[in-house]
Amino acid sequence: LGADALDPGAIDRVFEAKGRPRDRPLSLGVPDVDAALEYVAPTDREERFMRAFLPGPVTVVLGRRDPVPDALTAGRDRVGIRVPAHEVALAFYREADRPVTATSANRSGEGSARRVEAVSRSIREAAVVLDGGETPGTESTVVDPSLDDPVLREGSEADAIRAWLRG
């Protein structure tokens, strides 16, 4: 579910459409790692990690830069970055020429919609639906490389991520 990730009003509408609690941050979607660097300040190791796993099914939590609003991060000083390995999403991000909220097109607490037909009415009423075909339905692995236990949510490639971070 995408909206302008720098516009607090647009971000609020995403929270409303999803019924998502405002204390649960949204991720910021961009077309590539270089675009992400405008919005986050990774360490050298964190940037190497990004380049190793993005694009891919990973959300990397990093220190945010000033343009990223509190509304997106629930006031936290870190933001999740998504560069999906999905050509329709990447084309949308490139065309938007701005960071976009990166969250699943479902109501909070419901399973991810893998096909456009599974997108709930409340989401359809709040947004334009782009049909990029069926998605794998596997959640991204959420990683904060700065933590001792960096995997915050296990998803695709979790074992490879842990191995890279240990190495």
Model-found features: residue ranges?
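Active-site-adjacent structural elements in enzyme catalytic cores
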Residues: 1-167
